[in-house]
Regions:
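DNA-recognition helix of helix-turn-helix
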Residues: 61, 65, 129-153
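C-terminal edge and immediately downstream basic/flexible tail or linker adjoining helix-turn-helix-like DNA-binding
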Residues: 2, 128, 145-165
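A short pre-motif secondary-structure segment
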Residues: 111-115
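C-terminal flanking helix
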Residues: 11, 15, 36, 105, ...
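Internal acidic/polar
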Residues: 66, 74-101, 121, 156-164
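A short, charge-rich alpha-helical start-of-domain segment used by transcription regulators
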Residues: 1-16, 26-29, 40, 109
Length: 165
């Protein structure tokens, strides 16, 4: 496996996945960078895997979970402050969506990110997460319902926006 080519082919998808999990572009970049550093160290073994990109997503998922446990209160404060402005700001809809996704349980957020951001099927998500397809369908259904509820709340509007009554 040519690692440079593997990186070029997978890095954008992996970054989208990490951003979907964290809601923070800087944290997402850190997770992806660490995942590729680990992949580089294991590149010979990784070349033998059927799905090396799935291994990378698993590493990102575990790194994110580790950081959430370690950061605790600091992460809550950072999330309340919102993500830093990226070079090319995301659309208003993306900001609202990510803000709402932060409120979801991690299982729902992960399933939604895999399904909608990485176009993974229910069967692929089930295989990657080690659960039954029915569980994935439940996560997606509950995640969509919770996401709809979050998006319908007034507190997900951009600053300065208000309701006209």
């Amino acid at each position: 496996m040519d690692f440079d080519e593997f990186y070029r082919d997978t890095s954008r998808r992996l970054l989208r996945y990490a951003y979907g999990l964290t809601g923070d572009p800087v944290e997402a970049q850190d997770l992806v960078q660490e995942a590729y550093a680990r992949a580089w160290q294991r590149r010979r073994r990784l070349a033998g895997y059927d799905e090396p990109e799935a291994w990378l997503r698993l590493v990102v998922n575990r790194l994110a979970a580790d950081r959430w446990r370690r950061l605790g209160v600091r992460r809550s404060r950072a999330a309340a402050a919102g993500p830093p402005d990226p070079v090319a700001p995301p659309s208003e809809n993306v900001v609202l969506l990510v803000r709402a996704m932060r409120e979801l349980p991690v299982t729902h957020r992960r399933a939604l990110a895999l399904h909608y951001l990485l176009d993974r099927s229910v069967a692929e998500i089930a295989a990657e997460t080690g659960v039954a397809t029915g569980t994935v369908k439940s996560w997606l259904s509950r995640g969509r319902a919770a996401l709809a509820a979050e998006l319908s709340k007034g507190n997900n509007e951009p600053e300065g926006a208000g309701h006209v009554r």
